[in-house]
Amino acid sequence: MTKKTIVTLSDSNYFPLLEELIHSIRRFKQSENIDICVLDAGLSSDQIDLISAQVDEIKKADWDINIPFYKKGKEWLKSQISRAFLPKYFPNYDKYLWIDCDAWVNSWECIENYFKACENNKLGITQSIGPGYRSLAKVNWIFGKFAAIKTQNYKHAKMSGLLEKDARKIAFAPHLNIGVFSLMKQSSCWNVWQKNLKKTLAKGRVFGSEGLAINMTVYIDNAETEFLPINHNWITSHLFPVYDENDKTFREPNIPNNEIGIMHLAAGIWKNGVDMRVDKNIKVNIKSLEGKNLVKSLRYSNN
């Protein structure tokens, strides 16, 4: 039988989000056959005790690639590296599904799809592009007629010191958000990703390095990839969902209003300088499926 696990990472500051992610998974009966593994990047002993009965393995995250010493005090940055080495930490599984701890599972179908997507050693991942999504590209007009265009991929590539030819190859490729992905243990994608991660870390820039490396792996090295629908990794900072009051679930705001699979609070939802990820009391104005004005949190709630 194929052994599957969902893996995440957290420090002590994001522990409430970690608990919410775990609860959002375990509320589904289908999760009984799937393990949950946690990489510890600074959890307290009390926090570890609180989740131990709900998860299957907890391992201390390491610096799997050497980085400048002055970065090593920031334990949460280990998430930028360790997710590329999951089979090393948790070797007893055939399929891995990574979910950032600032994301949570809204509907189960997406979980099955991620595990299906990585079959035949493919990478299962979602592109950060879709109807209504905020653009990640910026244009500076020079002398009124020439355009200097900067995309998220190109910016990160140049900041990491990549060759211009490689930066241009990924400049206009739809950005891949590495907050949710699936891979089989024996996939060659791990080795290619790790190779690219070493390149992106060469100048000492850690934040964003793993995402840039996976974009290189797909768009430069042509790793076999299964692209999943945008609702499988819904970036709330790009576009708010709508809420279906009848079915008590979040949906895409555009017709046909597909149910959100994974809600991802990447980059945060900020109000008066406070991030919803650190204060669950923060609420935002969204629409109901029927068009009513609602004030809601986008964090997981079991109510």
PLM region spans:
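Glycosyltransferase catalytic domains, chiefly GT-A lineage
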Residues: 1-303
